Amino acid sequence: MQAFFANPAVSWTLLTTGGILLVVIWVLLSLAFLLLADRKIWAGVQMRKGPNVVGPFGLLQSFADFFKFVLKEIVIPAGADKVVFILAPLISLILAFVGWAVVPFAPGWVVSNLNVGILYLLAMSSLGVYGIIMGGWASNSKYPFLGALRSAAQMVSYEVSIGLIIITVILLAGSMNLSTIVEKQSGWIWNWNVFGGGLNNLVLLPVMVVAMGMFYISALAETNRPPFDLPEAESELVAGYQVEYSSTPYLLFMVAEYSNIVLMCAMISVLFFGGWNPGFPTDFLSSWHPFAANLFLALVFYAKICFWFFMFAMAKAIVPRYRYDQLMRLGWKVFLPTSLVLVAAVAAWRVFGPAA
């Protein structure tokens, strides 16, 4: 038995499987309480209480909703393509979770430390729209199909800007490894990429602040989040691509959507706000137990994710929905040329600046 566990292939498989399970459990538990927080924030803006019945302060509301969804009957429309109809939410959910494989929670706390992790994240976030397109087409109904087409157009429009903004971070960090990008931002708060990545690069502060703002807005559009929730606009498409879904498949779509939102919050934290770095030197952690030190840094990272989720929730609560033509105009006529200028500015500084 000891020889079996000493086998490198076996130990790697067990460690990777354990890491995947831990991340999935963490994401699911986080979604349960962040979804409640989203509803509470929305209620607070509208001067009402929000969910407050199930459990103390309504803390168990998400778990009650889970049982409500799971125990309902799965209704499949008569004219729907049954296989694709059921596969669509599963594909959306899987693609929403696989992106977490390269997110570094603390030094060494990452499922797969890929050297091209940032490209992997970009690819996974792009593929998520296929589940929505499949669901809209398989429903054999006008509203879901229109919602799916809107989602595809929206993703294409804003994925370009997200990719170009990521290039500015790659130019600053000199790496596509997410752990390396975070490590480059260690030390004081001015080493974070949003401030230019160090005092020597402080001239890039306005460039990176604009890049961060554009990334945040593009992330709202990428995740079909208000004010860019055109694929599920209630006043036009009832519920968009989710119209014909009920019970567990609907729940899977909702979990996938919120998982993508939290993943985008994690990306903003990693790319611009130092990831697990608290904004001051962490030399004092050398005297701590390694697990305790990493747990502290992981909590710092989680606090940043929660802050950005709060920003997503506030955008949902206070910003009115854009019209479809305004959404496209913003993506192609404003964000695309601006992001190209930002890439050129950072590249010029890296080539001709004092640190060249």
From Swiss-Prot:
Molecular function, one GO term: NADH dehydrogenase activity
Listed GO biological process terms: aerobic respiration
Cystine pairings recorded for this chain: none
The enzyme's E.C. designation: 7.1.1.-
Compartments, record wording: Cell inner membrane
Name of the protein in question: NADH-quinone oxidoreductase subunit H
PANTHER family found in the cross-reference section: NADH DEHYDROGENASE SUBUNIT 1 (PTHR11432), NADH-UBIQUINONE OXIDOREDUCTASE CHAIN 1 (PTHR11432:SF3)
